Amino acid sequence: MLLLGACQKKTDNDTTATYDPDAPTTQKSGNKENTSDSNTATVTIPEGYTLVKISWLMEDNGVCSSADFISAAQSYDLSKYGILADVKNAQNVCFPLEGYLFPATYTFKKNSDPTAVIDKLVETFQSRFTDDMKAKAASMGRSVHEVLTVASIIEKEAYTPEQRTLISSVLYNRLNTKKMKLQCDVTVKYCTGVIELQYPDKIDEYKYYYNTYRCQGLPAGPICNPGMESINAALQPDNTDYLYFVINTEPPYDSAFSASYDEHIENCTRMGYTAK
């Protein structure tokens, strides 16, 4: 991620290669898994999958159709679980359950009721987000929904575990600097790659709530379903004065963090990036 979108990677033939925030640091594909019982399916949801990608996984594994999963999610009773209290009252959220579908390995009956499938994912998240974590969020002056939103950005930005808490510090520092927007490229991709594909007639509305080059502060909600490492990083950011960072999108995924824009540009140049 290149905060302020200031840099692009230069290739050997002097063309630009833009950063793909979905590029994994480890294997992040949710594949079909063979089970001994033909009536069940074991499904692994990787960290960082969106609600829509989870729906594809369910269809690929015969659990339920993608369309039925999305429909059930969009009409889900948000009063069913206490952990959803924040999102129930949130404004301008496109996918209310985004961020609350915990990434893990599950076993489902094939041709399941999609609402029952969603129940299991949300219930697992509720069990993992402990009272201590809720208290920590409150001590930071943040709601569970806000912490999850930060965690989802961390999940999409970080290439290595060490980068998570540093990225977390950058996000909170920018949030606390009232005149600065987050300007995270991954939120733009969520608008164009998820919201616009699902709701093309609503993208002009939602881009003002999710595109952090446009909106002030956090997007309206999470942009993926983060894992525990990113959630913990959102709850325990490093103590820094950093406002910018650049990450090499190729191994070993080296990164540079800075407190000033000029230093950020220097870091981009040193790492082989060029200002737009």
Question: What feature does the model see in each segment?
Answer:
Residues 62-64, 78-276:
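Bacterial extracytoplasmic/cell-wall-associated proteins, especially those involved in peptidoglycan
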Residues 36-63, 136-144:
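Glycine-rich loop/hinge motif
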Residues 4-6:
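C-terminal motif of bacterial Sec signal peptides marking the signal peptidase cleavage site
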